[in-house]
């Protein structure tokens, strides 16, 4: 007939178990085996007591001695067992209290993260508003600069108009002077005309006088001439006089006509010049009036722009003051957040110390159980009791604790999850950029890789390469086309052919030769130039969290195993600010009473090693791993940091060997 422990062992062989559950089941099986052996031992003791009772009638003295010894051992054992039970109860209560406090701390951490996210969003909103106001200020500055330029242009036009007005006024003065000269010449011409008329009248009078004188002379001659020739002579004289008169009248008419034409032409020219000068003066006056009106409007606009500029400057000063106040407030909030994070880390360190105390208590109980096992083995050998087959198998098995085991993603997916065990994973990213182009985004499923030009200049990507390294696998390399250029501030996405994207250069490129960029726990994507110089890098590391609960014995204890492989070039993980180191313990050898050296204890290996049945003590080495999963980002939580604890378990007997023969010294 199988015991309950053997049934549970048989059932557990058909279900894949996690290492932590296996360890707990093994510990439970050990305790069950010890209880079975204790029951056998108690039965044997009872049979011996019955035999001793029958023998007590014959040997009273021996019975008294044996009864006293058995009574003392039994009372001591019951006392120690009661103390152990009380210790276990107190440990369970303390553990429940610690779990409640841990859940409360987690809630507080979530609230702090939410408050921090809200404050960061408010800060981003304020920064965006500041950028908008700066853009508005820049536009107003540009408008002011444009207005000032227009003002300078208008002032130049005003100066040019003033110079033109001065020229027109000078031309008007010249025209007036010419008009006065023309009027003077007209008066002079009229005077000359009057003089010529008077001369003509004088010449007429002289001519008439000469005619009369000539007539008298002819009359005198006619008297002397013959009567026959008198009539002919008079006719000839009349013709000559008539011809002379006609010639004089023609000359006088021509002279009058020429003088009138000259006078009329000069007078017409003077009138046209005066009219032209008058029109120019009117136009100049109109232009001067329009220029004055325009100058007044521009002066009003300039004063208005100056008022707007003063208002903008005042508003800018107010915005700068508000931004300074907001920045100081944000700094205070960040300082409060850092202080709260420091307090939280201190509380977590305190909780970790208390948890370490609980671990120490648990290890002490394990040592007592081991001593109890040794005591039972010694009693079984002394009483020649045969241990059960399960006990022999468990005594031949070595329980080794694992530290920092690297569990691959594919193996974790293939492993079936047990009841009460949940698992979650997330990616941690690390990026580095030394050039103009950065690795903006990497798809964890291997669909695409996105690059961004962070500078204000275009960058040629001809013959550049993207190198993808997944764990220890062979890297894959994508080479850009020779003439590809990435514009300033733009992005380019290189899609795998299996993603279903369309080729649309220069923003979207499809790698037809590769169906996927690949996936894994550690993904490193690097951008190389044509000379194989690395200018940008982004690394993704998967973080796996396993939560395991044991519902069979109503134990709510959680074990978190974090597989967090995060590689930095030239950086040691021991400098992680989120790492918590447990306190060291000094182990004393039960044989010689001296403290053990760490190097000797470490050389004995990691795990729980059971000695032979005849040894007086055994060595226990237990490795626990704690490390902050927050990394350098300031997050909280427990992660990997191997801490080894060594204990020496004795059976309560005094050592019979010399210190120089100690196995651990």
From Swiss-Prot:
Chain positions of motif Nuclear localization signal: 413-418
Domain LTD residues, every copy: 425-542
Regions of compositional bias (Low complexity) in chain numbering: 399-411, 605-630
Propeptide intervals in chain numbering: 663-665
Annotated localization: Nucleus lamina; Nucleus envelope; Nucleus, Nucleoplasm; Nucleus matrix
Residue ranges, annotated region (Head): 1-29
GO biological process: heterochromatin formation; nuclear envelope organization; nuclear migration; nuclear pore localization; protein localization to nuclear envelope
Residue ranges, annotated region (Linker 2): 215-238
Gene label: lmna
Function of the molecule: Lamins are intermediate filament proteins that assemble into a filamentous meshwork, and which constitute the major components of the nuclear lamina, a fibrous layer on the nucleoplasmic side of the inner nuclear membrane. Lamins provide a framework for the nuclear envelope, bridging the nuclear envelope and chromatin, thereby playing an important role in nuclear assembly, chromatin organization, nuclear membrane and telomere dynamics.
Biased composition (Polar residues): 427-436
Taxonomic source organism: Xenopus laevis
Region (Coil 2): 239-383
Protein name as catalogued: Lamin-A
Keyword Nucleotide-binding listed: no
Residue span, IF rod domain: 27-383
Region described as Linker 1: spans on this chain: 67-76
Lipidated residue numbers (S-farnesyl cysteine): 662
Keywords: Acetylation, Coiled coil, Intermediate filament, Lipoprotein, Methylation, Nucleus, Phosphoprotein, Prenylation
């Amino acid at each position: 007939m199988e015991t309950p422990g053997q049934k549970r062992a048989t059932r557990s062989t058909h279900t894949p178990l996690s290492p932590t559950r296996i360890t707990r089941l093994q510990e439970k099986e050990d305790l069950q085996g010890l209880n079975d052996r204790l029951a056998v031992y108690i039965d044997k003791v009872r049979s011996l007591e019955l035999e001793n009772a029958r023998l007590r009638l014959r040997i009273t003295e021996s019975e008294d001695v044996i009864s006293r010894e058995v009574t003392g051992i039994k009372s001591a054992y019951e006392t120690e067992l009661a103390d152990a039970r009380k210790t276990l109860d107190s440990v369970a209560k303390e553990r429940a209290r610690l779990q409640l406090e841990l859940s409360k701390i987690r809630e507080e951490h979530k609230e702090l993260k939410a408050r921090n996210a809200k404050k960061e969003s408010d800060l981003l909103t304020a920064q965006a508003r500041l950028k908008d106001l700066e853009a508005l200020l820049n536009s107003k500055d540009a408008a002011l600069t444009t207005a000032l330029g227009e003002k300078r242009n208008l002032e130049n036009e005003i100066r040019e108009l003033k110079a033109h007005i001065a020229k027109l006024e000078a031309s008007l003065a010249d025209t007036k002077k010419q008009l006065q000269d023309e009027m003077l010449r007209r008066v002079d011409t009229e005077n000359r005309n009057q003089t010529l008329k008077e001369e003509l009248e004088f010449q007429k009078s002289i001519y008439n006088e000469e005619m009369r004188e000539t007539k008298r002379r002819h009359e005198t001659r006619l008297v002397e001439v013959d009567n026959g020739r008198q009539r002919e002579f008079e006719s000839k004289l009349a013709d000559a006089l008539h011809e002379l008169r006609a010639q004089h009248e023609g000359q006088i008419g021509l002279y009058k006509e020429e003088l009138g034409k000259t006078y009329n032409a000069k007078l017409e020219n003077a009138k046209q010049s005066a009219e032209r000068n008058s029109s120019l003066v009117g136009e100049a006056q109109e232009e001067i009036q329009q220029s004055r009106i325009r100058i007044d409007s521009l002066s009003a606009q300039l004063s208005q722009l100056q008022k707007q500029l003063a208002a903008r400057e005042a508003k800018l000063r107010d915005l700068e003051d508000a931004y300074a106040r907001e920045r100081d407030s944000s700094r205070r909030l960040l300082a409060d957040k850092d202080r709260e994070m420091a307090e939280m880390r201190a509380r977590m360190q305190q909780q970790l110390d208390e948890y370490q105390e609980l671990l120490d208590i648990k290890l002490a109980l394990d040592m007592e159980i081991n001593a109890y096992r040794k005591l039972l083995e010694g009693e079984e050998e002394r009483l020649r009791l045969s241990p059960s087959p399960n006990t022999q198998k468990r005594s031949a098995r070595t329980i080794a604790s694992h530290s920092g085991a690297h569990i691959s993603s594919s193996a974790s997916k293939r492993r079936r999850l047990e009841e009460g065990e949940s698992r979650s994973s997330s990616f941690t990213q690390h990026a580095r950029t030394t050039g103009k182009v950065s690795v903006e985004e990497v798809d964890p499923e291997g669909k695409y890789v996105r690059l961004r030009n962070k500078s204000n200049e275009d960058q040629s990507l001809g013959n550049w390469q993207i190198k993808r390294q997944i764990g220890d696998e062979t890297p894959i390399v994508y080479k850009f086309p020779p003439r590809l250029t990435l514009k300033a501030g733009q992005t380019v996405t290189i899609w795998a052919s299996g993603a279903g994207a369309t080729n649309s250069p220069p923003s979207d490129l499809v790698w037809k030769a590769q169906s996927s960029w690949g996936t894994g726990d550690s993904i490193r994507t690097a951008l190389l130039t044509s000379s194989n110089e690395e200018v940008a890098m982004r690394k993704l590391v998967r973080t796996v969290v396993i939560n395991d609960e044991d519902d069979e014995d109503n134990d709510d204890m959680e074990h978190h195993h974090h597989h967090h492989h995060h590689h930095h070039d030239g950086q040691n993980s021991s400098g992680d600010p989120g790492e918590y180191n447990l306190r060291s313990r000094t182990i004393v050898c039960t044989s010689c009473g001296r403290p053990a050296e760490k190097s000797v204890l470490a050389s004995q290996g990691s795990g729980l090693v059971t000695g032979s049945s005849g040894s007086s003590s055994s060595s226990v080495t237990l490795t626990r791993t704690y490390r902050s999963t927050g990394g350098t980002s300031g997050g909280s939580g427990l992660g990997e940091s191997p801490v080894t604890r060594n204990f020496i378990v004795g059976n309560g007997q005094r050592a019979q060997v010399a210190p120089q023969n100690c196995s651990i010294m």
